[in-house]
């Protein structure tokens, strides 16, 4: 999947999310989307690197301490 396909998937999901609101006002969707994407991204990257946080942080383009904070936030061990 390339970046354009990922973007299309996000747009389709958001379109469905707004339809499902059924007139209710949306709230904090940025945080919702980031949380829905960030946790599995971190989990997958850690799995890909066999749990190596330094390699995962490098792949993600994050500082290792930032990765650790995000792991704590999402309860990832």
What does each model-found stretch correspond to?
Residues 1-5, 12-13, 19, 24-77:
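Bacterial C-terminal helix-turn-helix
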């Amino acid at each position: 999947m390339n970046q354009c396909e990922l973007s299309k998937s996000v747009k389709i999901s958001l379109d469905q999310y707004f339809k499902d609101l059924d007139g209710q006002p949306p709230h904090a969707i940025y945080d919702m989307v980031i949380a829905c994407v960030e946790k599995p991204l971190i989990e997958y990257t850690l799995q890909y690197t066999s749990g190596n946080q330094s390699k995962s942080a490098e792949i993600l383009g994050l500082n290792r301490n930032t990765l650790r904070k995000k792991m704590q936030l999402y309860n990832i061990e």
